Amino acid sequence: MDNYEKQVYTGRELFLKYDQDKLIEKYGLKQDEEYLYLKYIGTEYRINRRNGAIEYATGEEWTDCREYTVVMTIYDFLCCSGQEILPPFTGQWQPVGRFVTAGSSPSTDPFVEKYARAFSGKVEEVKQACICLGGKQTKRLAGADLTFEMPVLPEFSVLFQFWDGDEEFPPKILLLWDKVSLSYLHFETTYYLQGDLLKAILQIIG
């Protein structure tokens, strides 16, 4: 068993320690006797209430989820907050680096730039992909070609912005987070979620 698998099993064990009825109420989850259900970046997932395993919907079938970033983001979302009542979202958006002291967060520039280049010249395709994932287009901010509020988890959204490139400037992506986001996720998990969202958009536009 590699380190990733060990951490996934640790996530399962952590999830199983929680009062699932409280999680259902806290996050408004659909549920039955065997599973809890939630949507993550446009895909339906279910969590086995007995062993914590996560599966995703593929048509009429359910498939074991082996994507480390997806699994750990779902576990973290459900188990991160020790607060019985979560703070309401403020609608005040900020970059992820604002949550930490200067110089202490890893740079995501090369990672994000890869997706920005892939999206270059495809504003309409990116727009349609965001809509396909449940995104709601909002007013343009800071001159971005696209600004979308993207629902990524139950009642939890991020703001996705894309500037297409031209002769003077390269394409650019910026993800913004509500200022209370770290009441819902650990800081490290925001990087998993960001990667999963950009990957999902790219898969749709091809």
Predicted regions and their residues:
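Short amphipathic C-terminal alpha-helix that caps PH/PH-like domains
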Residues: I74, L78, Q194-L197
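Short Lys/Arg-enriched alpha/beta "domain-start" segment
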Residues: M1-E34, Y40, V70, F77-G134
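Intrinsically disordered, low-complexity regulatory segments enriched in Ser/Thr/Pro
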Residues: E44-T69, W163-E188
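Domain-length accessory/inserted modules outside core catalytic folds
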Residues: Y45, V100, F111-A116, A142-A144, ...
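Conserved binding-pocket/active-site segment within a compact domain
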Residues: G121-S183
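Short, charged/polar micro-motifs that form catalytic or ligand-binding hotspots
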Residues: D64, A116, L146, M150
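Amphipathic, interaction-prone secondary-structure segments
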Residues: I24-R50, K139-D164
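A recognition module on extended beta-rich or small alphabeta surfaces enriched in W/G with H and D/E
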Residues: D178-G206
